[in-house]
Each structure stands twice: as C-alpha cells, then as structure tokens.
Amino acid sequence: MSEIELVFRSNMDEHMNKIKEKYPDIKFYSYSKLGNFNQCKRGYYYTYIDKKVQKPSVYTELGTAAHTTLEDLYDGKVDKLDKALFDNEFKKCELFGIDFPKSKYDIKGGYYKDISAFYNIYNHIEAKEGDKFISELGFILILNEKSALMGYIDLLILHNDNSCEIVDFKTSADFDKKKVVEAARQLILYSLAMEQLYGLKVNTVSWEMLKYVSVQVGNYKRKEGIRGREWVEKCSTQIKALMKKKNYDPGLIDMYVALAINNNSIDGLPDDIKSEIKVNTYRRFFDITEEAKKEFYEYTLSSIENINKMLNKREEEWICEVDNFFCINLCGFYPKHCNPILNLSNKI
C-alpha cells in the first residue's frame, strides 16, 4: 500500500478527475446521498438539486465534535481524548437554539450523559507492532462506467501484511435488526472500496458505538452495549458480588456502590476492585456475507437508477413521505421550505 497514493480530502478531486478521463459519463454518489433520497425525496431535491440552505442539526454539530476529537487522538495530535471541543459545541447549540427533538423524555440530558461517559472511559484501540492508524481515508468505488461511490472512512487500522480493520464511529442509538441491515451497507461499501482501490484484505469491520459501553467485572459474564449514562448501575449487582467475594463489609459495599451509581463512575471504589473492572466503548462487529454484498449492490444500483428517473421531475413530484416527527424535529428544511403538517412547500 505504501506504493499507492492515498486519497484524502485534499486530493479527492484529483482522483475523481482521473476517473472522469477514463469514464467521461461517470457520476459520483455518496452513501449519505443515497440514504437521503430513500428517506425523503423532497429533502434530496432541496439538498442536491435546489440547494436550499438547511438549518443546523444538533446531532450533526455534536457528532462532528466527537469525531474530530477521535481523529486528533488517532492522528497522534493528543495523547487522550479532550472533551473541551464537545462541551464548547454543546454550549453553542444551547446558545443558538439548535435544539434536540421535543419529547417527554430528557433526550438532551441523556445524550450528554452518554457522551460524557464515552469521554471518561475511552481507551485507544490497541495496536500491534507496525500497525498504522489512518483517519478519514478517502475512497472511490467504481460500480460501472456511469456510477461510482465516494467517501471517507473514520478509521482504518493497517497491518504490516497489507490487511486491515475498518472502524466507523457512531454517536447514534444502537441498531435493531432492521436498522443493522441499513447501517451495514456503509461498512460493506468501505470494505469493497479498500479491496478495489488499495488491494487490501479486510479482516474485520465494526462500529464503535460511542454512547454505549462493554464491561467485564471480574470473572462474571461480560455485559455488552450498555448505555453510557447508566453503566455502573447496570453492573452494580456484579460489583457487589465481587466486593462480597473479597470479604468487604456489607455496609461498606452498599455505601461504595451507591456512590459509584450516583457518579456513574468507579473512581471512588477501592483499588483492588477497580483493577478487576474493565470498561470500554462498545465495539460492534459485523460479518460481511455474500448475501449482504448482494443486497448492498441491489440497493445501491436501484437507488441510483431511481434518482436518475426523478431528475427531470418538478419540485412537487419529489414527495415528502417521512413521518411528522422526523420532519418537525430532524429535517433541516422544516418549516421554512417544507411543512408536512400543512402539506405545502414554500417557494422561497
């Protein structure tokens, strides 16, 4: 791979132009572009065709901050994660009214607690001798002479034998069975691109779910995918059992664990107990099968075909079909340009 020029944001246009010389009719798409089209055609029209200005998204602003701090860590700019950037962006969102969705639940408070836990417990992914961490590595996957997918990978771990691991950072909620199929398409894309463009063997693909943790307490059963905001409470039974096994006084056990739950931290526990509690960000692996690859190609090619069929359609034919909760709380064009409640689109 050392003999191959790597693609980053700084030279992506250059690589795209080289491909255009070979395939003059080729068009480039991103994974998010296809997802945008399939989620809401009206949103796609406003984003990529009419190019209306969107209002900022709290999840985009804060997610970008978390990604940036991880990028700095793996680029070697810092030795440990710095939460200051995230906190600054959180305060900016409050100041400028970039709000979380309205709900009877405390979405804002829960999000902040989950991400705070991530910053408190995050451990740098272990590296073997000779491993290289590459952040925001660009790629172009040529599908055919008219279509290609391009984008950037959060983190690639490159080994000496030209094999690699792919890691995608996620600040979203964990995936259910339906969502995991949709989310996995992105990992499949990364894997196929690394094989096609760089000739790498991809050993594993995974998500680091930043709002969730994995915990090993002593020799007890490992707990995976616990919300960061409540991980100590969810592991409290095991922690109490471990302390009991080490002959701690029952009254002290209750006091120690109650304090740990209140702080969502084990910093106040005795050293011999802390040493037997291993906590890290939840890393969820996905096994890429031939069936999954087939589904990826079918989804991708049909999405591109459907986009091209719509290109000459009038604005009103790009229909908004998502639910009202998404439109009101998550869409960047509501209510200035699109209001599903009134079933109208303001021509601005």
Regions found by a protein language model. Give the residues of each.
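RecB-family 4Fe-4S metal-dependent nuclease core
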Residues: 1-348
